Curated annotation (Swiss-Prot):
Pfam families according to UniProt: MraZ
SUPFAM superfamilies (UniProt xref): AbrB/MazE/MraZ-like
Gene field: mraZ
GO terms for cellular component: cytoplasm; nucleoid
Protein name, as recorded: Transcriptional regulator MraZ
Oligomer and partners: Forms oligomers.
GO MF annotation terms: DNA-binding transcription factor activity; transcription cis-regulatory region binding
Organism expressing this protein natively: Mycobacteroides abscessus (strain ATCC 19977 / DSM 44196 / CCUG 20993 / CIP 104536 / JCM 13569 / NCTC 13031 / TMC 1543 / L948) (Mycobacterium abscessus)
Length: 143
């Protein structure tokens, strides 16, 4: 399970060091893709394969499903962390997430998110109220 908040630096070559506690779970390969809110999502390969299969099972006659699958496939990059636990983020991914040297990696239970540190802080400030007022209906009855 991926939990917590970490603040690695992005180096000049576009490499980001993944938190040490997640390296074993990601050692078999990982998939980096564009996510919502102009962040990046990092999935273990097996988890991403399940997501991709579900997306591919949607009706191809539905334009939204087709567009989602097309964008998901085109925006995904397979990575294998190096001996120091670093992955190289593509220029396209860095541009999409507007990443500076200061990044934030957050655990999102079954995947990781990579954010620019300033954008993550802004997101937290804008959505703080949502956390404390989340309704049971929107969270599928977990409370």
């Amino acid at each position: 399970m991926f939990l917590g908040t970490y603040t690695p630096k992005l180096d000049d070559k576009g490499r980001l060091t993944l938190p040490a506690k997640f390296r074993d779970a990601l050692a078999g390969g990982l998939m980096v893709t564009k996510s919502q809110d102009h962040s990046l999502a990092v999935y273990p390969r097996a988890e991403f394969e399940q997501l991709a299969r579900k997306a591919a099972a949607a009706s191809r006659s539905n334009p939204e499903a087709r567009a989602f699958l097309r964008n998901l496939a085109a925006a995904t990059d397979e990575q294998h962390p190096d001996a120091q636990g670093r992955i190289t983020l593509s220029a396209d991914h860095r541009r999409y997430a507007d990443l500076s040297k200061d990044c934030v990696v957050i655990g999102s239970v079954d995947y990781l998110e990579i954010w620019d540190a300033a954008k993550w802080q802004q997101y937290l400030e804008e959505h703080e109220e949502n956390f404390s007022t989340a309704s049971d209906e929107s969270l599928n009855g977990i409370f």
